[in-house]
A protein has these predicted regions:
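Short, basic, low-complexity termini and linkers enriched in Ser/Thr/Gly/Pro
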Residues: 2-23, 76-85, 147
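Metal-dependent amide/peptide-bond hydrolase catalytic core
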Residues: 23, 186, 191-193, 200-372
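Glycine/serine-rich anion-binding loops at beta->alpha junctions
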Residues: 111-112, 122-137, 211
C-alpha cells in the first residue's frame, strides 16, 4: 500500500498565504474559482491536481500526489477541450497529523468546460457544485479546525469520479487509520442516509432482414426490442423501505439498416437505479425478457447505506458516488452544498451563502465525529 509522504513545502499558488505550517483563513469563493478556472474534464485532471497539491503544501500539509493511469483512447478526447489527448492524472492526499476523519471529494468534471463567474449571490462554472465548490469548502473547514489546534483531519481529493471512480479505487490502496470518511457531493447540506446503486444493461435483439413490401419473409429485431421494453414497464422491480422502488431509464436505442428493410438488429441501453442486492433484479429481468433478447451487463455499483449523526438533516439520493470505493478510509458519510439538479448542466452554480454554510457544517460535523 502507498503511504502519505511528507511534501516538499512548495509555494502556494496565489496571494494571501500565511506562514508555512500555520493555519490561516481560506477565502472559499476565491479558492473555488481558482479550481473551477482550471479545466479538468475527466482524463485531464493533472493540471488542477498539481495546482491543488502546491496550494496545500504552501499551507504546511504533507501531500501525496498519487499517479493515476491515463484513460484509454478517445474517452479523454473531448470536443472543444484544449486537451487533444489523455494527459497526466493524479490524486491529491494531504494531512498535517494522523487523520481520524478525512474530507473527500473529486476534482474531475463532466464536459464541456466553462469558467467561473459571480452573478449576484451565485457562483457559476463547471464544477461549481460538482464538486470544486465542495472541495474548497472542505479545505476551508479543515483550516478552521487546524487554527483551533485540531490536526486529525485529512484530505482525500481524487480524479476519475465521473467515469468509473478509478481515482477512488487507487486512493483506497493507501494505508489509512482514519475512522470516518466525509465524502462531498451536492446534497443541499443534508447527510445522505443512503444512495441508490446502478445496474446498466444493453439489450440486443436479432431479426431477419427482408424487403419491407414482404414483411412476412423477415423478422423485425426492432419489434422484438419494443415488445421487451414495453414488458419492462409492468415488471415487479425490487423495493426497499428506505430507498423506495427500483426505477430505470432507457437512455439509448438504435437499430435497423434502412426504412425499407425489415430490421435485422436493434439494441437499447437500460439504466437501473437500484435499492439492494442486484441478483433479484437480474432474475426478474431474465424472467420478463424470457430469452427474447441478449442481455449484456455493462455496469454494476451497489446501493450504499451511510453513517448519520443526530442533529443533522438526512435524505436518500438516487445518484451514486465514490463512497463504495473508499472503504479503507473509515465509516462513510455523504454531505455537501449545492443541488444535484444543476450539476452537469450549462447553468451549474452554487449559492455563495451555501459555500459559507458548508464550511461551518463540515467543521462542526468533523468535530462531532472526532469527539465521539
Amino acid at each position: 500500500m502507498d503511504q502519505i509522504r511528507p511534501g516538499a513545502g512548495g509555494r502556494e499558488p496565489g496571494a494571501g498565504r500565511g506562514a508555512v505550517g500555520a493555519a490561516s483563513p481560506v477565502d472559499v469563493v476565491d479558492l473555488a474559482r481558482s479550481l473551477i478556472d482550471i479545466e479538468s474534464t475527466t482524463g485531464n485532471e493533472g493540471e488542477v491536481g498539481a495546482w491543488l497539491a502546491s496550494y496545500l503544501r504552501g499551507r504546511g500539509y504533507s501531500v501525496l500526489e498519487q499517479p493515476l493511469q491515463p484513460l484509454a483512447g478517445p474517452r479523454s478526447e473531448v470536443p472543444g477541450s484544449r486537451f487533444p489527448a489523455p494527459g497526466p492524472r493524479i490524486n491529491v492526499i494531504a494531512a498535517v497529523g494522523e487523520p481520524e476523519v478525512v474530507f473527500s471529494t473529486h476534482f474531475d468534471c463532466v464536459p464541456p468546460f466553462f469558467p467561473s463567474r459571480v452573478d449576484g449571490d451565485l457562483l457559476y462554472g463547471r464544477g461549481a457544485c460538482d464538486a470544486k465548490g465542495i472541495l474548497a469548502s472542505q479545505v476551508a473547514a479543515a483550516e478552521r479546525l487546524r487554527a483551533k489546534g485540531e490536526t486529525r483531519v485529512g484530505l482525500v481529493f481524487v480524479g476519475g469520479e465521473e467515469r468509473g471512480s478509478d481515482g477512488a479505487k487507487a486512493a483506497n490502496r493507501i494505508a489509512s487509520k482514519s475512522k470516518f470518511l466525509i465524502n462531498g457531493e451536492p446534497t443541499e447540506l443534508r447527510l445522505g442516509a443512503a444512495t441508490r446503486g446502478a445496474f446498466r444493461v444493453r439489450l440486443r435483439a436479432k431479426g431477419k432482414a427482408a424487403h419491407s413490401g414482404y414483411p412476412e419473409l423477415g423478422e423485425s429485431a426492432i419489434d422484438k426490442l419494443i415488445d421487451c421494453l414495453v414488458a419492462l414497464r409492468d415488471a415487479p422491480w425490487p423495493a426497499d423501505s428506505l430507498l423506495g422502488t427500483t426505477h430505470y431509464t432507457i437512455g439509448l436505442i438504435s437499430g435497423g439498416v434502412a426504412p425499407n428493410v425489415i430490421s435485422p438488429h436493434a439494441e437499447a441501453e437500460v439504466f437501473f437505479r437500484t435499492v439492494g442486492e442486484h441478483q433479484p433484479l437480474r432474475d426478474i429481468l431474465h424472467r420478463v425478457l424470457a430469452n427474447r433478447v441478449e442481455i449484456e451487463e455493462i455496469l454494476e455499483l451497489p446501493a450504499v447505506r451511510m453513517h448519520t449523526v443526530p442533529g443533522f438533516d438526512t435524505a436518500v439520493f438516487s445518484y451514486f458516488s465514490d463512497v463504495p470505493f473508499l472503504s479503507n478510509w473509515g465509516r462513510p458519510l455523504l454531505i455537501g452544498p449545492g443541488t444535484i439538479h444543476v450539476a452537469h448542466t450549462d447553468r451549474e452554480h452554487i449559492a455563495i451563502a451555501d459555500l459559507d454554510r458548508a464550511v461551518e457544517t463540515y467543521a462542526t460535523l468533523a468535530a462531532t465525529l472526532l469527539a465521539s
